């Protein structure tokens, strides 16, 4: 049997203990799902609804979201559907039952009003809070600003929503 030099044995021991410590202290990934209702003031108040699915690590999270801003042809308010992927930077722990976050992402969108439509891409930024209610159930408050590329009727949309969030 070949002997392992003393310096190598120390390195292997330190490496093994480091990997064991990191594995034992690693925070598990957390997922959540949100169903929401909200309002957009662009160009004037009208309803929005949608859902999101997210995965959070300690501070960084990822989210995929679908939202539908209803069209009102009588009031000449365009409809907007977005499919977005976002990165969240969030507080690692809840403070007084509240987890705060900031988000940025990119989306594909379709804006419609009657026969007119525009399909293109855009970006969004925003932030919000997830507030613990009972067990894994939380209320989510979210504000976003969407910047649409191409030739939309409105190049910037704002949105505020309140959602039911389930953490698992």
Predicted regions span which residues?
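Extracytoplasmic loops and strand-loop junctions of Gram-negative outer membrane beta-barrel proteins
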Residues: 34-36, 109-111, 147
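Transmembrane beta-strand segments of Gram-negative outer membrane beta-barrel proteins
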Residues: 30-39, 100-104
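Gram-negative (and chloroplast) outer-membrane scaffold detector with strong preference
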Residues: 54-124, 131-135, 139, 160-168
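Active-site beta-loop-alpha junctions enriched in small/polar residues
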Residues: 40, 67, 146
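Cleavable N-terminal export/targeting peptides
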Residues: 1-32
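Solvent-exposed loop/turn segments connecting transmembrane beta-strands
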Residues: 39-49, 72-79, 113-118, 149-157
